[in-house]
Amino acid sequence: MLYRSALRTSRAFTPRLALSHSRLVSSLVFLEHKAGKLSEASLSAVTAAKTLGNDTHGLLVGTKSEIENALDRAKEIKGLSKIYLARSDSYSHSLAEALASLLASIVSAKDVSHLFAAHTAVGKNVFPRLAGLLDSSLIADIIALESSGDTFTRPIYAGNAVLTIKSSPKDSVKIVTVRSTAFDKAPVAAGSAVIEDVDIITVDTPTQFVSEELTVSSRPDLASAARVVSGGRALKSKESFDAILNPLADSLGAAVGASRAAVDAGYADNSLQVGQTGKVVAPELYVAIGISGAIQHLAGMKESKMIIAINKDPDAPIFQVADVGLVADLFESVPQLVKELGNVKV
């Protein structure tokens, strides 16, 4: 099902930045990183930006040490002709007020026609504020775009329909977040980007960073893992969830995920939730254990390359999207699978 719509924004107030359309010649990608480690999702945003055929530039923001660590990999990204650096301690925690003001100033000074970021927590926090500063529409969570640069595609209704959006010609810059699973990652090899520092923008804001608690895990990051093992409410308890899923995930070198039902029941942390209101993943292998296959969960994993489902209910909706299905008691079949995997190299 295809819908076509044109987004319009109210022009009740004067835009804070007036840009000349004749000078808009480049695309800018916000290169997200965590403590100097470049986000894999940003590589997909680079690929989306390259679709337009414009010069594509990147932006790294953070403390001096963070940028030095991230730049080693960022400057190797194929397709970026320039990387802007904004080095300041005020950017160390990605506060939306500071980053939005910085991005707005760069858009004005560097002739940017399109601004891209991955549709992550940071992108979803910063880009709506930026759209407000520039008085432009926010085009969020796209899965495709046309080379014309004004037509975009995004999923709606939990991925059961696709919306085609034609942005308003009044928007001085197109502000876009990208669903990373919909685009290949830009190669990190043989890059030749020119490095340029940009002016730091100081923002007077009441928002202050207080603290953060990081969960340390030896497993791959769920959002970018090549293999994911997810569990549902059928695991019955947190103890069973850990006892059944963790050995299989360890055998496969996989990340652990969970359905919303499992998270709501307290079996797994909210950070592990896969689905419409959780993380959207598209690994090479997705193993769904004790997950019925509610539409909200399918929206977060149905683009996986290979889906294996284990469920004792032969009518479970998960089997409709699975490439391989096993109708069995998970408490018997999964330990047996782990035992068999111990005899082979995965």
Curated annotation (Swiss-Prot):
SUPFAM superfamilies: Adenine nucleotide alpha hydrolases-like, DHS-like NAD/FAD-binding domain. GO terms for cellular component: mitochondrial matrix. Binds 1 FAD per dimer. Pfam families: ETF, ETF_alpha. It is found in: Mitochondrion matrix. Its cofactor is FAD. InterPro entries: DHS-like_NAD/FAD-binding_dom, ETF_a/b_N, ETF_a/FixB, ETF_alpha_N, ETF_asu_C, ETF_asu_C_CS, Rossmann-like_a/b/a_fold. GO terms for biological process: fatty acid beta-oxidation using acyl-CoA dehydrogenase. CDD domains: ETF_alpha. The keyword Mitochondrion applies. One of its GO terms (molecular function) is flavin adenine dinucleotide binding. FAD binds at residues 285-313. Heterodimer of an alpha and a beta subunit. The electron transfer flavoprotein serves as a specific electron acceptor for several dehydrogenases, including five acyl-CoA dehydrogenases, glutaryl-CoA and sarcosine dehydrogenase. It transfers the electrons to the main mitochondrial respiratory chain via ETF-ubiquinone oxidoreductase (ETF dehydrogenase). This is Probable electron transfer flavoprotein subunit alpha, mitochondrial.
